[in-house]
Amino acid sequence: MKNKIAFVAVGQAGGNIGQLFEDRGFNVLYINTSQEDLDTLEHAKYKYHIPGGEGCNKNRRKAKQLVIDDFDRIAAEIETKIKADLTFVIFASGGGTGSGAGPMLIDLLIDEGRAIGAITIVPGQNESVKAHIILTTVFQS
């Protein structure tokens, strides 16, 4: 089962959840615009830093542009690191990197003919209004 399912963990929240899966033996590729966040994933086997940003600070548009600018390298990372029958993309829908890059990466993987699932982390009741607005835009796109 662990060879048939893999994960692409996007952003800080996605990375935190991805670690739980990697700790249980699943293959996980961590993608983030923040090198600092990637550095907290001490035992991660595969990490990719999207250049040009040190986090997106709830700026979904910035994350989307960084993915567009680095699209070929991100696609190559996924192609070489993620070999599975089913790939889940994990991302927060109320942040910056995850909410901007997560849906784009799902589209990339679907275009490659992969079977995809999404694990979307929604903002809690105590999170900012901005996080809830971002959530709405993620599900509208």
Task: Describe each PLM feature range.
Residues M1-S141:
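Tubulin/FtsZ superfamily GTPase core signature
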